Amino acid sequence: MRIVLITGISGSGKSVALNALEDAGYYCVDNLPPHVLPELARYLAHEGQNRLAVAIDARSSASLDEMPGLIRALSREHDVRVLFLNASTQALIQRFSETRRRHPLSGSPSHDADVGLLVSLEEAIERERELVAPLAEFGHQIDTSNLRANVLRTWVKRFIEQKNDDLVLMFESFGFKRGVPLDADFMFDVRALPNPYYDHELRPLTGLDQPVVAFLDALPVVHQMLDDIETFLVKWLPHFREDNRSYLTVAIGCTGGQHRSVFLAETLAARLSRQASVIVRHRDAPVAVDASSRLVT
């Protein structure tokens, strides 16, 4: 059975991800107590269901300590994938304010208070980060701070299409002016490269458009940086495999996330596609949804 566990921070998009999996034919359960999961998997397998998606968050805090061992045990019998959704505190506060929802932990007494004061939203978010942090190491992390819901749904569908027998390498382009991604294992700053933005004909385009591709591809310094990053990754990918890593996110950042970082992410994804299963995602570039997150084959 394929089991997808969705966890992370409240407000980071777990409901959106779960809905995307339901549309893909998964049997979906929100906030299932972890200890019930093995029994549910056995029951569904007996009933002929082969795809299960479960969202787990801090509302199950009493059982979160069981999750690492539970994931290992389930992985011996099933194809288990863990998706850990994260977002910046600022983005989460804005989302809770817009929806007027209450954070699951906001009604708990503050650890620092001698009386029964309720914690602030920011305190609740930070407490939840501590509770769910051990689960992050088991799956792929994705920063949804700057993701639209439709882009997240597209990315989740790409995520479940990946084979589970190899390390998945994700190249993510971004713009520093919108903040650094929280989900990056490695981050490369390419702002030292010539910027197509200063060419008025190239400014409205992206690193996916042929005129920008031609501009950057003609520069030796761009190829030097590409070669250096590729050499580093090719050297260290075997070590990550030996460490049983399932996912590795490489973030490529330029000023706005529109030209240079997009071109380099695309080029590196193509170069490394024979070394690993590859996903490329463009966080900040104004591109179509189907181009913002895709598999590289």
Swiss-Prot record:
* Segments crossing the lipid bilayer: none
Q: Keyword Nucleotide-binding on this protein?
A: yes
Keyword list (alphabetical) reads: ATP-binding, GTP-binding, Nucleotide-binding
The superkingdom of the source organism is Bacteria
Q: Does the keyword ATP-binding apply?
A: yes
- Entries under Pfam families matching the protein: PapZ_C, RapZ-like_N
Q: Which GO terms describe its molecular function?
A: ATP binding; GTP binding
Where, in this chain's numbering, is ATP bound?
G8, I9, S10, G11, S12, G13, K14, S15
**Residues that hold GTP according to the record:** D57, A58, R59, S60
What does the similarity note say? Answer: Belongs to the RapZ-like family.
Q: What does this protein do?
A: Displays ATPase and GTPase activities.
The identity of this protein, by name, is Nucleotide-binding protein BPSL0529
